[in-house]
């Protein structure tokens, strides 16, 4: 028995019956609050369920529907809907956020994590921001060259949208129009076809997907490829957030 186990046992021994009852009651309250919060989140996620471009909530839910029965690892730092809708129960299911919040982190980090997961046969999955991938697109070639199994699902909102939102907030705070906030941060004209980009580097791909009804089949196909030990990218054109 290690020292931490001994410490835990001693804490249990010294915990009184009244304290254990207090812990139980607090646990019940927290469980009820969690259940209520999850119910609210599911209701929020239903907004724009059939919208095109695809809602980011539906993208996360469609992924979860097929991942929850697998041994999976979420290997990127984008966490909004996954953290609210997925059931994270193991330490390896989330690798954490980028420490400095720098753009260009997600693709190299997720492929590196997928390499680490390869020996365990886990399904590594990444929801990949489009602007972030444009900083280091060569990471796709690395995944193909070294046969790193990873499912990369693009959140393709056709902009460096973190920056767009920042300037929208700044414009509104100063009473100015937000019409010009996409200038310098848009990724359209021409639109980027990430499926073709991936294919050009040897990565299997689907998309661009604009109809959410096409997601399930593409995800199923992608998981099958990853189980064969290969990378796969699904280009999903999404709502901004």
Can you describe what each PLM-predicted range is?
Residues 24-36, 236-241:
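A short, charged, Gly/Pro-tolerant segment at domain boundaries
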